[in-house]
């Protein structure tokens, strides 16, 4: 509720020139922006559906990983996928070191430390490292240390790899349908 109030206060005096009609007119299957948006809205629910169908706990991790990896250009997406996987593995290793060295009374603060780290991280790879702390701090209590670590890595790898493959196929199909090269197809 507080976020809504702050958003309203900061935006109430802005004039928006684009109405629903303008949004609908801007929809163009040959546009790289439209393709990127369609890829997001189709891929993320598919990842969640498949993770749930496979009875993977914490399916939202796969969905969030996919959502964060999907960017308009494939070259950028490939870098994000790589950074997400490396960042998660590094985050797991850092978490394991902290978990081993710190007393149990401090475990709850590992997640908070991760949140602070995400806030101060300018690079996506480092955000993935610190984001892992909070996720594992919660999941460890539910699944045990080994289960939480395995689940975190598996869900993230599944989410970003599926998103990469899906978007590559999606952009390829959209190029064939529209007859125009999409921005997403570059560098694949």
How should each PLM-predicted stretch be described?
Residues 1-130, 137-188:
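Alpha-helical transmembrane segments and their membrane-interface boundaries
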